[in-house]
C-alpha cells in the first residue's frame, strides 16, 4: 500500500506501518550496448523527444518505449521520481506486470522500460540512473532515488490476528519473505 494522506488518517482513524522499500530500475535488452541514462534523457525518451538510441551512444535505431498500466505502483514511482510527473508518449506500449515488462524488453532489442529492482535478472539489463546503480543496497541507503516505501495500513490500532500478522512481517522470517519477493525490509520504525 501507499502512504496515507493526513485527511485519510483524520477521517478514518487509520494507522500506517512502513515495512519495505521498493526501487524501480530502467531496463533495456541485454543486446543493447547502452548501460547508463540521466534523468533528463529518461524524461525526453518517455516524452517522445528522444526517439533514437544514437542520442544515448547506442545504435542508429528507433527507441521503443514500454510503460506499465495506469494504477501500477511501479508506474507511479517511475512517473513521480524519474519523469518528475512529466508525460509518457502516447505511442508507448503498455504492459501489465513486471514479468510482462521483462518479457517485452527481453524480446525487443530496441525497447526501454522499467521494473521493480527485485525483478531485474539476466533477461534485461538495468541502466545506471544519474550515475547510480539500481541495487538493493543503493535503494536501502537512499543513494538510489527511484524508490518508495510500502505500507500496511489499519483502521485504528491493530489487534488480534492483524497485530500478529504485522509482528510477523517485522520478524526475521517476515523480512526474509520480503527480501525473497524483491523488496528491502525496513524493520519496525
Regions found by a protein language model. Name each.
Residues 1-189:
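Exported/periplasmic ABC-transporter solute-binding proteins
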Amino acid at each position: 500500500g501507499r502512504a496515507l494522506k493526513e485527511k485519510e488518517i483524520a477521517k478514518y482513524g487509520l494507522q500506517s506501518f512502513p515495512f519495505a522499500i521498493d526501487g524501480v530500475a530502467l531496463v533495456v535488452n541485454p543486446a543493447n550496448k547502452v548501460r547508463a541514462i540521466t534523468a533528463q534523457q529518461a524524461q525526453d525518451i518517455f516524452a517522445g523527444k528522444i526517439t533514437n538510441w544514437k542520442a544515448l551512444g547506442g545504435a542508429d535505431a528507433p527507441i521503443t518505449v514500454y510503460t506499465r498500466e495506469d494504477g501500477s505502483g511501479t508506474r507511479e514511482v517511475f512517473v513521480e521520481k524519474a519523469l518528475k510527473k512529466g508525460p509518457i508518449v502516447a505511442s508507448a506500449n503498455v504492459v501489465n506486470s513486471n514479468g510482462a515488462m521483462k518479457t517485452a524488453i527481453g524480446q525487443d532489442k530496441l525497447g526501454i522500460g522499467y521494473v521493480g529492482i527485485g525483478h531485474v535478472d539476466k533477461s534485461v539489463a538495468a541502466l545506471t540512473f544519474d550515475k547510480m546503480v539500481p541495487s538493493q543496497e543503493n535503494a536501502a541507503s537512499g543513494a538510489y532515488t527511484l524508490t518508495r516505501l510500502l505500507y500496511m495500513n489499519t483502521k485504528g490500532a491493530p489487534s488480534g490476528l492483524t497485530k500478529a500478522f504485522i509482528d510477523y512481517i517485522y520478524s526475521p522470517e517476515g523480512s526474509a519473505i520480503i527480501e525473497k519477493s524483491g523488496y528491502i525490509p525496513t524493520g519496525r520504525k
